[in-house]
Amino acid sequence: MLGHKVVGRVVGEDRRVGVPWLGWTDGECRYCRNGRENLCDNARFTGYDLDGGYAEYTVVDERFCLALPEGYSGLEAAPLLCAGLIGYRSLRLTGDAARLGLYGFGASAHIIAQVARHEGRRVFAFTRPGDEEGQAFARELGAVWAGGSDQSPPEELDAAIIFAPVGELVPLALGALAKGGSVVCAGIHMTDIPAFPYELLWEERVLRSVANLTRRDGEEFLALAPQVPVRAVVEAFPLERANEALEAMRGGRIQGSAVLEVATS
C-alpha cells in the first residue's frame, strides 16, 4: 500500500500520530547501535516494505509513530513527516552555513526555507528555468534571491541542498559554492551526475547524500516547527483522486505539497 507519510488517529484512542518514512529498524545492526538507524541494514519503510497511507486504516509499529505538535491540522502536519523531515536532516548536514542555496523549490524546500530564515540564514532559491511563479513563491517565503537553476546566484553559497532529482544540478551547485562549502543531495533518487572537473570539488568542498531519517530527527523537527512557525502550503485531493494528484506532482503543477484526504464517517 503506497503512501509514505501518514497522519491519523489510533483506533480506540483519542490520540493523533504521525507515521514517517522510516517504519521499522532491527535495533541490532552496527548502524542502529551507533545512533544511525536511518542506515539500518534491515530497515523497512512506510509505503514501500510496509503498508502506507493510501487507505482508511493501516497497521504501524507504535515505536516509530511521532507525536504531532498542536496547532496543525492533519493536512498541515502530513508534509512535515517526509518533506519536512528529510529537509531538516539535510539542513543539519550543512552545519552553520549562512548563505544557503535550495535547488528545486517544492515540498521540502518551501518548508526548510522557513526554518533556515528562522535561524538567520540567507536563502537563495533555484527553480526550473522560467518558473516565475515558483520564484515569486520562494521570495514570499523569505528568499533573498530566486532564479532558474541555469542562473548563478549573486554571491557565493556556503552550502546548497539539491531537492530536485536532477544529476545535472550537482556541478552547477558545486560551482556556486565558496571554498569549504558543501552540497547535500536530499533525494532518494537522482539521474546520472555528469562528469565535472576536479576543480569544482577542490578547496575542501564536500558532496554528500542524505538517506532516510531517524526518530530523533522527527522529534527535534516537530518540536521546532511550531516555534518557527512552519506553515506547509498544501493542495488536498480526496483519496479516490490519488492518480490525479500523482500526475500533477510529476508535471510540476503542485505548489508546496499534495496531500490525500481520507473521508471519515
Predicted feature locations:
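Glycine-rich beta-strand-centered segment in the early N-terminal region that forms part
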Residues: M1-R30, F64, P69-Y72
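Mid-domain Rossmann-like dinucleotide-binding core that forms the NAD(H)/NADP(H) cofactor-binding site
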Residues: R16, E70-P153
